[in-house]
């Protein structure tokens, strides 16, 4: 019936320890085939080693059939015992013939009691073993024309008690067991291909050379579901077909980076379904890899939905610190994905110029490449298992990449990869943009200058003219040009305020009076220190107290100016010696008296009775100027000191010595009293002398009259002005019997330390009298009214006429 016999070589690599058969005996494995009609029958039995060596074949058991359409067949039971301790035996080789027409797979066969012990009870333990079946199809004489190898991985076995019949009450019919699928590899000898996974059980067996790396990858084909174990062992099965589960024999081998990367690409749609629009999608996909793998090993019958639900619950209870490792893993996977796309783009660009023009077009085209071209891509990925990837694994995830990339936000590594692909076109434009701001064009500068001129106005707009003027030394003109008129609205508001009497009064009350005096003087010298101290004292005063303090001195000054000032002149005993010539009484000169003089600068102003100041000059260079040098003090001529110091005093000419004082006509200012005697005809003839300004040059000496001045004729300053001037009418010398008022006495103050009677002084001419309006700060003693009036430019002409008439 068989046209071409098929031979199988079965190698037993591992035998479980635990239960053993009869002592000194080990079991061998026998495989036989028979053909009956359209069915194939195969029997696998275990026999003692002696029987196997003799080549005895077991009889075919009843009901041991195999359907031709079965694609995944496994051993239901493979009972055997471990050989006794002793020298290691080689693998058992059994050759059987099989018809070539049927499929080269094994089907289920009943669990007949193949090995029994003496007590008639088989062991209940289970073990795992690997069986390699090598098939050869021979025509005529036996020769290795076509060689095929099947790798069968046996799951835990079930031994049954003797006497149990298939389908009986004692032993129920066995069910299919979950095992690794059959991986056919054409034209390759893969005997011993699972040595690395199972720990390398070589044991010196005569095995063929190791297979290529592609055969060492775990199977990708999903396994079928199976029922529960009849003896209450652990359940088996798997999750949904889209979930990859590690087979039991590959648990010791860690997943490669490349496989985890592919699983991560498969799990991204699942993670996005549970976390839509979330940045944690990639990290959750990495988290699903170990969690779903553990759930599949613990409970293979668990569905995919249940596994995802458990994984999501575990993810929610995971802390952020524990999630960091998954974020890092997701970042690496994104880099792998971007690098893979870059390599695909490069491979497409190398084919021809049709994909080069736009950078965005090549990114969309490589998503559908043929399968043989993608095999080269794992070489560029930085993973250990990249070259081991089969060609059938890469195409499936490609249709999902555009979907996942379109939904998730582009992470940083991905953006870097995209920018690398887009960098070449814009590079020539960037340097041009950076070079533009290095040099400012003159048009922009001119426009900026025009705008600033419009904003600042025409005064600063013509910047060239003021700069030239400053270079030439003209500084005042730019200052005048820089002045801008104030706001007309502000001016109108100020005028409105000034028109109110109450406002002006309040402002005048607040302004410091000393500041007003300094401001109205021609040469103001403000004492900021004294002013600041006084203002600090006034800070603690209220408004009413401040107004009262400001108005009170003003009222006193007004009353003092209005009251007439009459009285005899008094001089301080500590003042310098003075001598006053009065008419022809002083004609005898005194040769013992020396004459010396120094000039004093004029720095004063005065006011007349109406408050108007008048400056008088021309007295400095007069030949008849009075120069006096006092030598001795006369006890008869002393002036009483004033009872109270003046309110305002400012000396303008320093003293020459302790007892000698030098005064020049015009050398010190003179202020006229507001209340002179109205009955004096001489005073009516004299104009209102405000003050006399002297020259800085030395004046010629002249002799004083010899006649002494009576004690009643001593002069005393009546009033001191704000600029240090005083007034002395000298009424008794003119024949006036007017006594000074008490108010005026209170304001008197001596000019010098002491006074001395005037010695005999020569008189240049008769008819000269001393005016009561003249100052005694420089010891004026002999000149007459005309002599004093000679310093006044208004009476200089009258003086000349009188001299000419004489």
Swiss-Prot record:
Biased composition (Basic residues): 404-415
Domain of life: Eukaryota
InterPro entries (alphabetical): NUT (IPR024310), NUT_N (IPR024309)
Annotated Basic and acidic residues bias: 465-479
Compositional bias ranges of the Pro residues kind: 206-216, 355-372
Pfam families for the chain: NUT
Region of interest called Disordered, as start-end residue ranges on this chain: 201-252, 345-494, 555-685, 703-806
Family recorded in the similarity comment: Belongs to the NUT family.
Name of protein: NUT family member 2D
Organism of derivation: Homo sapiens (Human)
